[in-house]
């Protein structure tokens, strides 16, 4: 098919995102160009100057006769000339050292793509070639294909069209000058595109004839659609030819010519651009993730066991974030029925107490007494004459105000929530990361604790006391020497002190007002420093297995030593080893009465018959430790001598101190401590319990997870990791039972249809089904999701009913119904496993041992061996905490 065509070269050709040249309609075209005919998204360099035809006149559009279809011969070049290589435009955002002009789509893809998401033009004003007179290009030879840029001025043509399908012979592959940024353009030389014209600076010289390219050397079916378009107004240049490339291995490609002045064309183009933009964004995100992965400090792959005390060489951070200043609400505080006007500081403290009115804390006398003492300390002498008793204080109005604010917060719009999330993310990006030795690390607790009332754990004697507001003048920063000191975020305040101590890992610290203890800003658990400490801890515990036998022989031998001190040391070590007790420290009168092994009193132990003892005391966090256990006979006899003649409040190990015990442990093995004993016993217990799994009994993933949790439960019991049963446990169990009953009803409905269950049961099933639908509707209305906020109750009811009926629709085929029955059986089993797990673990906390005492490599090896996804056992935070735990299936603690 011979194609004759007049083409006016536009003054500037923009990028076309890698679209390949395609055969245009068989037309003879004359263009008229002015400033109003450009695409909004493809503005020319000088939009206020009009373009004229070469001779300054306007030519009429002349349709060409309809030619007979012919088969063009493939050509790799035009008139024997090779394609003109593209010159890379000057781009300040591109890599300055890139010398290959054909690689700009690779080196600058992130910059050009981001620009093109909002506009097709990615060049700055300085990159735009000067306008040149438009000259006529000679007609191309038969079989060649011309191409117009997407950003060229529009041309409206009156065309006589034909549709021809041809099969081209294989042509030599042409090396791409630029790879497209589209997803479909990376794997074919067809997409090498004559885009070189869009970046070429040759327009500043003499316009050159554009070489045509044929598709790659594969057999293709090319369908060329030619359409007739007519207009009586301005005649824009025809839009870019779109190439829709098949992603499969087929060699068929469809080339469409877009209509030039169709009313819906702009919408189509916008949609396509949006789709391309989304693809680009996804691609950029993937590349970003890869770059982030490449930037991860895989310190665990480096052999560096030396420890000279230096924790870091360079340290940069922006300091902690302080809570916002208090904003007074002006809600009245009542005393004995009368209003007492409060200052902002007094009102703030009163609001702290009002926040706990509906909790168990206000039921504790110590909480109320301590608060009232703090509150009275803020009152003036005149106010103290009025406010004398806590029982007459009325905080209910403030409490109502707080509840209203809470409801308002829940009712926030999606836009408000998004804005708040964006603000938090902005703060996190600034303060939530530190740069250590060139690596970006997360900061754990970068928020300064806000003021409030101290709660404490268990029966803490200081519960209810006021936690004062922390200011920058209370905070000491630790930062690299010579680094920029972050400014104080509160005007008029200065940091207490700036230090450069590279032998510690904290970033900031201050002293809290209640107990006088220090609070620190640490790096996150996923950081290198924390990870190294964790791995070292587990390696030390793992090494204990090599000498645990000798240590045990040593303390067992000392049970009968003449020295009381040695006998007490031996029995204490035995209890720490056998029962995984904490070492225990002496506590002051103003601290909670929690004890460990060395601080046990006679009242905490009861000697039963048959070498059995019962220990009953408050452990860490005031959690009760109650355990009746049979011990060694020789240890039992020695304990009897320790108890004899002592009062209940006397120490059981009165000749032993924590320092003596720790010093003895260090002599047994480097790094050994009571905590190492707990870590060793916890990890070895998990290892032994997991090794007991019968793969025939536990086959599904859910069954294996239940088995793992049971093993973890044994460790939690050993370490006394308890928790109070959830308050809504009964409700949760009831919901699981209802779900199981529903699944069984659905099974029976399937069986009734195939005649496996008597229809007499159908009435009971339908009765329960009738009760379920209203409940589901009410639940959906009560718990509206953000996407359903605009829907009426009637619309939600309709949607729920439709979904309910759809879920109850049964197929006609008997085989399909049997498949449904089997599927329901799997779901029933899953719910039963869930119920069993919740019941068994209702008073046991599994998380504490996973975080602190269980070598994560044991779990990873077990998961790999039994084909259980690690994320079913470890949360994301735990996976981030233990990146070094990726081991093979043969790992043994």
Curated annotation (Swiss-Prot):
Q: Where is the composition biased (Basic and acidic residues)?
A: 218-228, 237-248, 413-427
Listed EC numbers: 5.6.2.1
Further remark:
Eukaryotic topoisomerase I and II can relax both negative and positive supercoils, whereas prokaryotic enzymes relax only negative supercoils.
* Naturally occurring in which organism (per UniProt): Dictyostelium discoideum
**Identification of the protein by name:** DNA topoisomerase 1
Catalyses: ATP-independent breakage of single-stranded DNA, followed by passage and rejoining
Q: Which residues lie in Acidic residues bias regions?
A: 33-42, 103-114, 184-197, 285-294
Using the UniProt annotation, give all residue ranges assigned to the region (Interaction with DNA): 519-520, 582-587, 673-675
GO cellular component terms? chromosome; nucleolus; nucleus
GO BP terms: namely: chromosome segregation; DNA replication; DNA topological change
Task: Kindly list the GO molecular function terms attached to this UniProt entry.
Answer: DNA binding; DNA topoisomerase type I (single strand cut, ATP-independent) activity
Where is each Topo IB-type catalytic domain found?
526-893
Disordered: region residues: 1-305, 404-427
Query: What are the subcellular locations of this protein?
Result: Nucleus
Q: What are the residue positions of the site described as Interaction with DNA?
A: 409, 457, 506, 537, 594, 620, 662, 721, 739
Which keywords appear in this protein's UniProt record, sorted alphabetically? DNA-binding, Isomerase, Nucleus, Topoisomerase
Summarize the protein's role: Releases the supercoiling and torsional tension of DNA introduced during the DNA replication and transcription by transiently cleaving and rejoining one strand of the DNA duplex. Introduces a single-strand break via transesterification at a target site in duplex DNA. The scissile phosphodiester is attacked by the catalytic tyrosine of the enzyme, resulting in the formation of a DNA-(3'-phosphotyrosyl)-enzyme intermediate and the expulsion of a 5'-OH DNA strand. TThe free DNA strand then rotates around the intact phosphodiester bond on the opposing strand, thus removing DNA supercoils.
- Which family is this protein grouped under? Belongs to the type IB topoisomerase family.
**Comp. bias (Low complexity):** 91-102, 115-126, 135-171
Skewed-composition ranges (Basic residues): 208-217, 271-281
Positions of the catalytic residues:
853 (o-(3'-phospho-dna)-tyrosine intermediate)
